[in-house]
Amino acid sequence: MSDPKNVIFKESECLEGIFIEGPDFDKDIDLKAVLTDYYEKIGFQATHLGKAVKIWKKIEKLKKEEEMVVFLGYTSNMVSSGLRELISYLVRHKKVDVLVTTAGGIEEDFIKCIKPFVLGDWNLNGAILREKGINRIGNVFVPNDRYIEFETYMTRFFDILSKKQNSENKILSASEFCFELGKFMDENLGNEKEKSIVYHAYKNKIPIFCPAITDGSIGDMLYFYKKNEKDGNLLIDVANDIVKLNDMAIDANKTACIVLGGSLPKHSIINANLFREGTDYAIYITTAIPWDGSLSGAPPEEGVSWGKIQEKADFVEIWADATIVFPMLVYGVFK
């Protein structure tokens, strides 16, 4: 048996690297310095956030110097929350080049231009809320009158699309649907559209891909429209968008993939980058776990195994609520 003292006080090798250290608030220090100078040294997920700031700064530098295509993917709950305004900021200032989202990411952006969502509570009785016509997304409330008014707008919008389809003898893709929606917002909504992602994507000609465009309220409205309208032949083509999205990755000199959440937007982006032998940079923000084999929880190294992220890519995954860390990430990079 070994000497217990030798076991406890086992000699260690000399270890070089970044020393763990937090910010000293006795010094004159601001949030920018905390994020850029200290977060990487704190450890745990703070280190990942600090690394993400550095990676995105590299991306931004390369975007200014050479052809760099930045893909941003986000699930609808990001738009349900106040992250919508952050994404709109990035689009407005052309910090991203391609957007991929779910149907909720489109429709909730539009609905917020009609009336705002309201801060609620996680624990209220669902049956009582249903009786009052109040929908709950986490601790965010969306009264149903928003959707009622949304249908009025969408019926008019579908009429425009249907006439366009018939006159041009062309079926619009989902990304063209989103572009036309941005144009419709420009022509029909007030100042609230200035906070909109879809509106600024239209103004800056930044494509929005939404492969599951019917999986949400837009799909509900399409159902009623096609059932009730005499001219119910309105169609949306999702096949052309896969060509357009993949070609944007293939034709790029370098690419970066920034993903909030998981599911369809995440896979659409990284799978497009498979066609160019993987993305050069990747930043994931997620709370999904990898242990169930889901795409949402798949870490960057899993993407490397598929060829969706390059072996030598600069990447990081932050395992955290995006509503907490994404504002700090954007601030650390752009402010």
Curated annotation (Swiss-Prot):
<dbReference type="GO" id="GO:0034038">
    <property type="term" value="F:deoxyhypusine synthase activity"/>
</dbReference>
<dbReference type="InterPro" id="IPR002773">
    <property type="entry name" value="Deoxyhypusine_synthase"/>
</dbReference>
<comment type="pathway">
    <text>Protein modification; eIF5A hypusination.</text>
</comment>
<protein>
    <recommendedName>
        <fullName>Probable deoxyhypusine synthase</fullName>
        <ecNumber>2.5.1.46</ecNumber>
    </recommendedName>
</protein>
<dbReference type="Pfam" id="PF01916">
    <property type="entry name" value="DS"/>
</dbReference>
<keyword id="KW-0808">Transferase</keyword>
<keyword id="KW-0386">Hypusine biosynthesis</keyword>
<keyword id="KW-0520">NAD</keyword>
<dbReference type="GO" id="GO:0005737">
    <property type="term" value="C:cytoplasm"/>
</dbReference>
<comment type="function">
    <text>Catalyzes the NAD-dependent oxidative cleavage of spermidine and the subsequent transfer of the butylamine moiety of spermidine to the epsilon-amino group of a specific lysine residue of the eIF-5A precursor protein to form the intermediate deoxyhypusine residue.</text>
</comment>
<feature type="active site" description="Nucleophile">
    <location>
        <position position="308"/>
    </location>
</feature>
<dbReference type="InterPro" id="IPR022899">
    <property type="entry name" value="Deoxyhypus_synthase_arc"/>
</dbReference>
<comment type="similarity">
    <text>Belongs to the deoxyhypusine synthase family.</text>
</comment>
<dbReference type="InterPro" id="IPR029035">
    <property type="entry name" value="DHS-like_NAD/FAD-binding_dom"/>
</dbReference>
<dbReference type="InterPro" id="IPR036982">
    <property type="entry name" value="Deoxyhypusine_synthase_sf"/>
</dbReference>
